[in-house]
Structures are given as C-alpha cells and as structure tokens.
Amino acid sequence: MGLPNPGLTLEPGRTALVLTDLQNDFLSPGGNGWALFADSYARNGTVENLGRLLKAAKAAGLPVLISPHYYYPTDKDWIAPGGATEALMAQLPVFQRRGPLTLDGLVGSGADFPEQFKPHVCDGRTVVLSPHKVYGSSTNDLLLQLRKRRIEKVVVAGPAGNICVEAHLRDLLEHGFEVAMVRDAIGGTSNEEGDGVQAALVNFRFLAHALWTTDEAVARIADLSR
C-alpha cells in the first residue's frame, strides 16, 4: 500500500510562510555554521530559493514569520548537557547575541539576517518571533502568533532541514496545523550515519501534508493574489 498524499490547498487569510534560522551563521559565507551546509546549498539552490519564497509571500500579502535562533551570555550558565548538535552549536559558536535587550553588535554578526533578505524581513510587517533555543518552536511564540492570526496552513523552510525545520514541522502538526514543506529550500549536513537532507526529505514525506519544490510553492502562493 502506498503512502497517502493528503495535499494542501492554500487559502487567503488562513496561510502563512514560516522560515527558521534565517541568519548569517547558517546562510552567509563566513558564517560560523556555513561550512556545514554549503554543499547542500549548492545542490539545492537553498539560499536563492529562500529568497524566492520570501518575495512570493510578500507579493501575495501572506504573513511571514521568522523563527530565529539566539544565544545570550546567560545561556552559558546552562548546566544540563545538550545533545550532539546543540553541543556543536556551542562549540562553533553560532547565533551569539550580547543580550535580549540590546542590539549592540548585532548588525552584520552571525545572528543577524543576511543583507539580501532584510528588505523583506525588516519591512515592519514580518513577524520576528522570540528565539527558539534548541530546535523546535516549543520555546518561542510561533504557535501563539499563528493562532492570533487565525492561520491554519503553513509553508515551512529553512537551512537546517532535519534539525530545526523538521522540529518546527513536528510541533505544528502536534497542534493541528496543515503543513507544506519546500524540499529545495532546506539544507543539511551529514554524519557517519548518512545525509541530513535526505533524512529530512524522508521524514517530510512521512509527516507533512505536502512536499513541494520552490517552483511549486511560489506558484501556489502567487495564485492566492489572483
């Protein structure tokens, strides 16, 4: 028996775009985590495709929510050990901020947004969420922000496909949202067990309502404004 393909029909007023970790450390050459993902970006066109999704969502008037990852100096006081990727992020380090109440040192840092995305992210309408602290949205306000907007359908993408992107997918599903994933607007790294991008795609197909290319996602988003 084949795996069902539920599909997802986007609807104006009920649909949003959610992007995770849209930050220099993962998405810009020279970022502390760039080398982990660079090969997958080259294969997928990930950085360009994330830009295309942003542009399409803005043109269609779709709400855009960015789920950033920030670490503050006080986070170094954590005692409980993190898992493998959490430990790696601390070693690199990535997404460092001087504190939650200051922007000192943020501009151009690894925690900042890539310059090419700022016209869309910093337009006064994009929702920049409180930071997720490990992988998923249980530590930020994504679910609240979606519910307050009566959003029920979400298109999700971001650089760390089998880590933060998948964690957000799982959180959204557990709370009743319909979710479409964008297969070539993700990245990933590999370890001795296999390739992270392929692991993400396998699980996206098992879990999500739909798995689209960027071309498909952009076309479906554009249809909302017609």
Residue spans of the language-model regions?
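Active-site-adjacent betaalpha module
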Residues: M1-A16, D25-F26, R43, R52-A60, ...
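A short alpha/beta connector and helix-capping loop motif
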Residues: G13, G31-A57, G61-P68
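N-terminal nucleotide-binding beta1-loop-alpha1 segment
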Residues: T20-D21
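Short, well-ordered beta-to-alpha junction loops that form the rim of enzyme active sites
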Residues: S67-Y70, P159
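Short catalytic/ligand-binding loop motif for oxyanion handling, primarily in non-cytosolic enzymes
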Residues: Y72-K76
